[in-house]
């Protein structure tokens, strides 16, 4: 059978038309999102998408359910039942039925119900504080990763400027070598410096990409999504030092708001409540109950039967614990030991928090001093390097002198950038200890 070229063409065209939606769908599935985030955006995104945080939120919801249910335990319980039976024997067959409605309520249980409600309320508040603690820890991790990426991004900018300068120096060196004004070794040094600067840029880009990837992990973001961080204004960091409170005030604020300390306080309250709950085992309990019911045998005069068989009952019961084989006594002792342990942990936590905040405070002071020293040094080396560039253009200094000054400037610049973002990190960490939100 002979197939025309036109038939082949139309068949191929039809296949392409049919396949186009499939290709489009595949393209849609491979598209990735693009984000431009400030630090605050990163923190909000992480709070909304962190799987660990969602798990903690579910635990808090479960605690809320337990608390709500325990409050309902003050109410009476009500139940109803109904049955219908059929029997058959040599004397004949018969039907019988019963219906009952009953209620029971705890009148007194040694305060156990109220203590259980209080226990669940404290557990709920503690769960919320655990969530706050997690948020603070996650915020610090995001801050550190974000600032690391900013540092590499800023360093990359300066390195690209230096690479442009190295490129011009290399071109000038080749020109001057051709006319015999410099040695071949000097020209090769300039070319080697250009290659070295290019390599530094590649390494910094790799470090920047890795820091962005680490940030994506903290944000629970798809690693294939595109994330660009927005550079905040960091031109004048003196305000960070100007707004620094006294060390005593920083410690005082941390003692009032720090989640780890709050959790220790809740542990003490829970332990105290556990003692009260354990002691209820010594006390009697009183419950009351009431019920109504009716029934029938066969279906003759059904209404009259319901009336005749209608019954009511009510009662009250008293349960007095006499001897529980030492279980209640042991429970009280264990609860008291747990309270002593909670109080000891609280004292240790107080000490740790004071030490931690004090160290954080002095880290800020040290970071600021390092930043100011490196800022002055960077300004001096920048001016010196610019002067060396001009002198090199006029042939007043050697290539070795120029490259030595350039490398010195790059080292000083790298220290300046590290000290700059270290100051921001240390200051914001102190803010978190003091219960403040992170902003840049």
Model-derived regions, located:
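Extended amphipathic coiled-coil alpha-helical segments
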Residues: 54-73, 114-175, 192-199, 206, ...
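C-terminal segment of classical bacterial N-terminal signal peptides
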Residues: 15-23
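Acidic, low-complexity, intrinsically disordered peripheral segments
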Residues: 2-6, 25-32, 40, 223, ...
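Small/polar (Gly/Ser/Thr/Ala-rich) solvent-exposed segments
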Residues: 54, 77-94, 107-133, 262, ...
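Periplasmic alpha-helical coiled-coil/stalk elements that build and connect Gram-negative outer-membrane
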Residues: 2, 7, 26, 137-253, ...
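Hydrophobic, lipid-facing positions within transmembrane beta-strands of outer-membrane proteins
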Residues: 97-103, 250, 312-318
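Bacterial Sec-pathway N-terminal export signals of envelope proteins
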Residues: 24-79, 223, 229-269, 438
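A short glycine-centered flexible hinge/capping loop motif at secondary-structure junctions
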Residues: 177-181, 392-396, 433
